[in-house]
């Protein structure tokens, strides 16, 4: 049982050793607050435009109507099979 548990641990340790040292991380760039806010605002505007375009495409498509009709027809069939009146 010990051998069964120690083999995976040994493999993980060997992989860590063979991987070598972790590369040094670069110093974070000094970004002033205004450029960070500008990037955030640009991202927000882009996201807003994409979401508006997505919802306008859905409104213009016939998918919601087809889906609503399909659910209505399916519900009607189930009611007929169960003899439920509404």
Curated annotation (Swiss-Prot):
- Transmembrane stretches, by residue range? none
Q: Where is the protein situated, by its record's location annotation? A: Secreted
Keyword Transferase listed: no
Sample GO molecular function, one term: phospholipase inhibitor activity
GO cellular component: a single term: very-low-density lipoprotein particle
Q: Which InterPro entries match?
A: ApoC-1_sf (IPR043081), ApoC-I (IPR006781)
Q: A biological process (GO) annotation for this entry?
A: negative regulation of very-low-density lipoprotein particle clearance
* Signal peptide residue numbers: 1-26
Q: Which UniProt keywords apply?
A: Lipid transport, Secreted, Signal, Transport, VLDL
What Pfam family is a match, any one?
ApoC-I
Family membership noted in the UniProt record: Belongs to the apolipoprotein C1 family.
Describe the function of this protein.
Inhibitor of lipoprotein binding to the low density lipoprotein (LDL) receptor, LDL receptor-related protein, and very low density lipoprotein (VLDL) receptor. Associates with high density lipoproteins (HDL) and the triacylglycerol-rich lipoproteins in the plasma and makes up about 10% of the protein of the VLDL and 2% of that of HDL. Appears to interfere directly with fatty acid uptake and is also the major plasma inhibitor of cholesteryl ester transfer protein (CETP). Binds free fatty acids and reduces their intracellular esterification.
Further notes on this entry? Apolipoprotein C-I is present in acidic (APOC1A) and basic (APOC1B) forms in P.paniscus, P.abelii and P.troglodytes and perhaps also in baboons and macaques. The two genes for ApoC-I arose through a duplication process that occurred after the divergence of New World monkeys from the human lineage. In human, the acidic form has become a pseudogene sometime between the divergence of bonobos and chimpanzees from the human lineage and the appearance of the Denisovans. Pseudogenization resulted when the codon for the penultimate amino acid in the signal sequence was changed to a stop codon.
Q: Please state what the protein is called.
A: Apolipoprotein C-I
Q: Please name the source species.
A: Cebus capucinus (White-faced sapajou)
């Amino acid at each position: 049982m010990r051998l069964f548990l120690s083999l995976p641990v040994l493999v993980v340790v060997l992989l860590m050793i063979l991987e070598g040292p972790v590369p040094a991380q670069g110093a974070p760039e000094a970004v002033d607050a205004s450029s960070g806010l500008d990037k955030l605002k640009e991202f927000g505007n882009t996201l807003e435009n994409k979401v508006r375009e997505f919802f306008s495409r859905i409104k213009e498509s016939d998918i919601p109507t087809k889906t609503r009709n399909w659910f209505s027809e399916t519900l009607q069939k189930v009611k007929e099979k169960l003899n439920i009146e509404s």
